[in-house]
Amino acid sequence: MNPTAPQGGQLWSRCGGCASLLYRKRLRRNLDVCPECGAHSRLDASARLAQLVDPGSFTALPDRAPEVDPIGFVDVLPYPHRLTAARSGTGLVEAVVCGTATVAGHRCAIAVMDFRFLGGSLGCAVGELITRAAERALADRVPLVVVTASGGARMQEGVLSLMQMATVSQAIAALRESGVPSISVLTDPTYGGVAASFATNTDVVLAESGARMGFAGPRVIRQVTGRELPDGFQTAEFLLRHGQVDLVVPRHALRGRLAMLLAAAAGGRPPVGGGSRSEYSPGDRPSAAACRGEGQDAWETVRLARHPGRPTTLDYLETGFDGFVELHGDRLGADCPAVVGGLADLAGRPVMVVGHQKGHTTAELMARNFGMASPAGHRKALRLVRLAARWGLPVVTLVDTPGADPGVDAEEQGQAAAIAENILTLTTLPTPVVAVITGEGGSGGALALAVADRVLMLEHAVYSVISPEGCAAILWPDRSAAPQAARALRLTSADLCRLGVVDAVVPEPAPAAHHDPPAAVQAVREAVLAHLVPLLDVPTATLVRCRRRRFRRFGASRLGVRAGAR
């Protein structure tokens, strides 16, 4: 599918995708991507490094892995003879090149695999070299970047090659434990033991356009199952749809995307130590000045909160934040379109943003399931907030959902458990969290993104245990009583501010956000900054303790509200 880029003095090259005859210099100028069909040719490690890192910045690691022939393997040739031939043909010592470099000025340790060397297979020496690169990243506290190209474990080294999956994985685990970022770049092909270890257990997984990745190769799958495989099976685009990778990036954009990720990783705050801060007290109820929206009719507010012209999460990200890089997938087989999230810049600070996404048109709403997250959506959000905690990034959540997906599939896939795990994780997340209810805050689907240090709410948003229609159908029972139910539920921003559920109400441009979306976006940006910045210097232990205290106050013994009180 993706033949190796031609070497030496060849003047012409035939594309492996469309069979076009291409002038070699033109192909090289286009980064070995066919200008006719976009097929990406395979690159050797040297060419890959030249495209990704800053000129002159790469320094190879001084260590050289020992020669190994652990089991004396012989097929038609002794294994050492195959190693000699591979070294002669590639000029490499092994199937990976490791060192340190900068990408757009950001330091990293980097390991680049080369498929030309015995199919990029993972043997003891390759595992040792990548592990040393990870250990260098840990020692220097710089991100690790791994560019994969491999057919899998090296058969000639027997089960010891299998052990390299664990060896490198535990080196990645050490990076996670220490909060040192790791990023993998999947190139064609990435299979077997490499795919099932360090290629996919990094913090962020990028895939070059057209790259194929899987545990078993397509030929094996056909033989075992006796079935034909779907078009595009195991390609980067297939993997994205099935939640396996964060991004699919064409080669010309790969360096830029990598630079943005490294910049975000470098901008994370280190854990703040020390004792408690007496001036930080999220247990206090909001002041009357913070509670706007007095006198608004609850049912009319519901209608405004649902207006399709209100800004969506992607609208807020487009103009209220800078440099958004969306990260996809739950890593378990799906990418829910009702939840979007990723890395963004807020006034020079990298943040993780996660939110529900609805849309403005009927087609958009249907494609996004009206902002109703599936279990995959909640698990994607969970993965991203955990990543934020590891990288030391604050979290901003934007809540706009009528509720979690109530379908049969969602129940079969563990909707309740997915929501529960989000709530549990957010209660102890060791990084600042600011949540904004921007439209509808529907029940547990909303709370799954709204357990936060500060909860803000737009003036004409709503937040409720159930929709007014649902409440009316159950308790009246008459769906036409929805307006009456809305008033009884106390779901407006002013009501919830008085109850202490939200900390502040964000004013909307008159008469509501959909009349002036840019102004609404700016108001949210300013409010998030005002509430987030003071949290950045709070010691982690204090932050978590105060967040727990914030939600503990909603117990019956602490509310101080008499039965039947209005």
Swiss-Prot record:
Positions of C4-type zinc fingers: 15-37
Region annotation (Acetyl-coenzyme A carboxylase carboxyl transferase subunit beta) ranges: 1-243
Region described as Carboxyltransferase: 11-534
Principal subcellular localization: cytoplasm
Keyword terms, alphabetized: ATP-binding, Cytoplasm, Fatty acid biosynthesis, Fatty acid metabolism, Lipid biosynthesis, Lipid metabolism, Metal-binding, Nucleotide-binding, Transferase, Zinc, Zinc-finger
Residue intervals of the CoA carboxyltransferase N-terminal domain: 11-280
Region (Acetyl-coenzyme A carboxylase carboxyl transferase subunit alpha): 244-566
Pathway where this protein functions: Lipid metabolism; malonyl-CoA biosynthesis; malonyl-CoA from acetyl-CoA: step 1/1
Region (Disordered): 268-292
GO biological process, one term: malonyl-CoA biosynthetic process
Catalysed transformations (reactions): N(6)-carboxybiotinyl-L-lysyl-[protein] + acetyl-CoA = N(6)-biotinyl-L-lysyl-[protein] + malonyl-CoA
Residues covered by the CoA carboxyltransferase C-terminal domain: 282-534
Cofactor(s), names only, from the UniProt record: Zn(2+)
Nucleotide-binding found in the keyword field: yes
GO molecular function: acetyl-CoA carboxylase activity; ATP binding; carboxyl- or carbamoyltransferase activity; zinc ion binding
Function: Component of the acetyl coenzyme A carboxylase (ACC) complex. Biotin carboxylase (BC) catalyzes the carboxylation of biotin on its carrier protein (BCCP) and then the CO(2) group is transferred by the transcarboxylase to acetyl-CoA to form malonyl-CoA.
Self-association state and partner proteins as the record states: Acetyl-CoA carboxylase is a heterotetramer composed of biotin carboxyl carrier protein (AccB), biotin carboxylase (AccC) and two subunits of ACCase subunit beta/alpha.
Entry similarity comment: In the N-terminal section; belongs to the AccD/PCCB family.
UniProt name for this protein: Acetyl-coenzyme A carboxylase carboxyl transferase subunits beta/alpha
Lineage, opening ranks: Bacteria, Bacillati, Actinomycetota, Actinomycetes, Micromonosporales
